[in-house]
Regions:
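C-terminal segment of classical bacterial N-terminal signal peptides
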Residues: 4-12
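N-terminal secretory-pathway/extracellular module detecting exported/lumenal segments
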Residues: 11-113
Length: 113
């Protein structure tokens, strides 16, 4: 699967099939947009929603490399509690390792185990 093709997948404004992942260390609730998941034997691209305790919602476009066991944030869309968007950020950072008992590990396990 071409990374360029994966990066072309659109946003999540109309996402309706959110799968609950669990809480993060801060108590925020994490969900995967099932409709956005593009997965192969080697990698995956998906949208991850984080409902913060204060009511704001963050949506992360993430790329996961299965065999490198890394996760990379490509984009973040932030919304206020009333749904008003307040920030859209494109990222160009190095992938981070997926380790231990983390959200990245939970998502990795949902995708490939």
């Amino acid at each position: 699967m071409s990374l360029l093709w994966l990066l072309s997948i659109g946003g999540t404004a109309n996402a309706t099939d959110w799968y609950y992942v669990g809480p993060d260390a801060s108590g925020n609730q994490l969900f995967i947009d099932n409709d956005s998941v593009q997965k192969s034997d080697y990698d995956a691209l998906l949208w991850l929603r984080v409902n913060e305790l204060g009511g704001d919602e963050l949506r992360y476009k993430v790329y996961i490399s299965r065999y490198n066991r890394t996760m990379e944030t490509l984009k973040v869309d932030a919304y206020m509690a009333d749904g008003t968007p307040y920030e859209n950020v494109e990222y160009n950072e190095n992938p981070e390792p997926i380790e231990g008992n983390t959200n990245g590990q939970a998502i990795y396990n949902l995708l490939w185990q």
